[in-house]
């Protein structure tokens, strides 16, 4: 009996020990598999909830963005920095944009143009249009009678009264093309008529006839500039005449560039400030500082920017920082933070500047841009930057400096826009805003040619000294009339003629 009880107790103890001993490896694996299965189910459930949440949020964002971009106000905000009918410009202008962007631009501007054409005129505008159309009919009668001088004056009067009327532009263009042999200006008026009324079949037919001829003339002009550039490049840098010309032109560049912005310093006073750093009596501190800022910017170009393969936003900011370095050090090198208005042009808002400047930088360094003729490239860059108007002040000076930087990199001397030509300068910029940048490019080409003529004349064997600049408007008009021919010889021109259209020099 005792033996039986003992065995029973041993059996109980063995079962107890069996229940308290650790599990075997097989049990452990089963437990781990169950835990992993449970974790996998939980993880999949969480992932599903996350995906559903992101899908709902993404769908809502896409719907909101579509609704926003479909509104006309959003399109206006994104596209108002471009001029009306910009899609009609030369194909070099939009080659860096995608097909979708081009279609968006065209759709937007087609609507804006049709709206502007169909807009109601004020009573005064209607009166001017009626008078302009009357003058137009009378001009055509005078032309048929053989009185072309009177007809020309009547056409000009009609254009002054209604400069944006397609019929006036069309008929005056035909008169210029067939009677005055001015096919370039005629093509410009046909272009404007099409910009205002794209469905005008007569303007379209005329434009198709003149466009190729005008393009050929422009290309020949650029080839002529290249020939003069090569002739200047053949002159050795050690030439004393070339060094004198560079030094004199350097003073004139600063004088003209600040003069366009309203600075009243004379050329002699500008030269004195740069050479002596002494103040001029009767002139404001800002006028002194504008000259010193241009001097700093031009030295920066000569020392650094000309040698760079690519020009970045940082380089443009550094250039602007020097332009305003003495006038407004706080705003120098900074994008504006407020909306500005420049005559009838409304530049983009400050919130759009970063994106637009990034696009401008991308265009500036693109392969397409580098394939353009240097004069076209420089003129486009000048216009694009001044149109964006990224700074509170100094946009014009910075744009002209950038233009000259690009020209100098291509072997051209830096050119000047004479202060006497200020009204033409702004007029051609206005035409570019309205859709045709070609007149502005031709204006820059004119300035480039006069600069080249200046250097070629100054380095010739003629005994005269480098002349002083003509500064009066009447003298400028007289010299302009004498230099209408684009192929005038440098050796045959008179001394003042060159300096009326002279370009800037770089620091020797």
Swiss-Prot record:
Q: Which UniProt keywords apply?
A: ATP-binding, Hydrolase, Membrane, Nucleotide-binding, Nucleotidyltransferase, Repeat, TPR repeat, Transferase, Transmembrane, Transmembrane helix
Q: Does the keyword Transmembrane helix apply?
A: yes
Which membrane topology term applies here? Single-pass membrane protein
Q: Where is the Fido domain?
A: 311-446
Q: Name one GO biological process term.
A: visual behavior
Which EC number(s) does the record attach to this protein? Answer: 2.7.7.108, 3.1.4.-
Task: Give the comment on domains.
Answer: The fido domain mediates the adenylyltransferase activity.
Q: How does it assemble?
A: Homodimer.
Q: Which family does it belong to?
A: Belongs to the fic family.
Q: What is this protein called?
A: Protein adenylyltransferase Fic
- Taxon lineage: Eukaryota, Metazoa, Ecdysozoa, Arthropoda, Hexapoda
């Amino acid at each position: 009996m005792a033996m039986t009880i003992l065995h029973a107790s041993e059996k109980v103890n063995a079962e107890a020990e069996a229940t308290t001993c650790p599990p075997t490896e097989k049990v452990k694996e089963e437990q781990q598999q169950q835990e992993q299965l449970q974790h996998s189910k939980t993880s999949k459930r969480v992932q599903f909830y996350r995906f559903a949440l992101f899908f709902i949020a993404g769908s809502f964002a896409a719907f909101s963005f579509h609704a926003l971009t479909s509104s006309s106000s959003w399109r206006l905000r994104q596209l108002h920095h471009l001029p009306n009918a910009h899609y009609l410009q030369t194909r070099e202008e939009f080659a860096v944009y995608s097909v979708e962007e081009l279609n968006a631009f065209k759709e937007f501007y087609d609507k804006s143009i049709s709206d502007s054409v169909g807009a109601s005129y004020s009573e005064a505008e209607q009166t001017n249009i009626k008078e302009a159309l009357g003058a137009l009919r009378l001009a055509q009668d005078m032309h048929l009678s053989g009185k072309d001088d009177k007809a020309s004056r009547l056409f000009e009067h009609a254009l002054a009264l209604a400069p944006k009327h397609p019929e006036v532009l069309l008929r005056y263009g035909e008169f210029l093309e067939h009677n005055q042999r001015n096919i370039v200006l005629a093509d410009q008026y046909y272009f404007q008529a099409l910009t205002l009324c794209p469905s005008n079949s007569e303007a379209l037919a005329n434009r198709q006839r003149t466009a190729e001829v005008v393009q050929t003339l422009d290309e020949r002009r650029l080839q002529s500039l290249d020939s003069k550039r090569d002739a200047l490049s053949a002159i050795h840098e050690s030439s004393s005449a070339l060094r004198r010309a560079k030094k004199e032109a350097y003073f004139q560049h600063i004088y003209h560039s600040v003069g366009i912005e309203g600075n009243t310093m004379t050329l002699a006073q500008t030269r004195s400030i740069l050479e002596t750093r002494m103040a001029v009596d009767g002139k404001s501190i800002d006028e002194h500082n504008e000259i010193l800022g241009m001097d700093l910017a031009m030295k920066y170009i000569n020392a650094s920017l000309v040698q760079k393969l690519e020009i970045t936003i940082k380089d443009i900011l550094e250039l602007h920082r020097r332009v305003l370095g003495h006038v407004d050090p706080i705003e120098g090198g900074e994008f504006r933070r407020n909306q500005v208005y420049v005559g009838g042009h409304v530049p983009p808002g400050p919130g759009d500047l970063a994106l637009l400047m990034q696009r401008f930088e991308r265009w500036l360094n693109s392969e397409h841009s580098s394939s353009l003729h240097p004069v076209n490239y420089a003129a486009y860059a000048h216009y694009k930057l001044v149109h964006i108007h990224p700074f509170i002040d100094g946009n014009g000076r910075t744009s002209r400096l950038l233009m000259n930087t690009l020209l100098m990199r291509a072997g051209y001397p830096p050119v000047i826009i004479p202060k006497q030509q200020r009204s033409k300068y702004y007029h051609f910029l206005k035409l570019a805003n309205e859709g045709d940048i070609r007149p502005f490019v031709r204006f820059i080409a004119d300035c480039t040619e006069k600069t080249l003529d200046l250097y070629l004349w100054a380095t010739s064997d003629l005994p005269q000294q480098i002349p002083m600049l003509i500064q009066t408007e009447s003298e400028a008009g007289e010299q302009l009339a004498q230099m209408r021919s684009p192929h005038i010889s440098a050796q045959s021109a008179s001394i003042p003629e060159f300096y009326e259209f002279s370009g800037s020099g770089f620091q020797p």
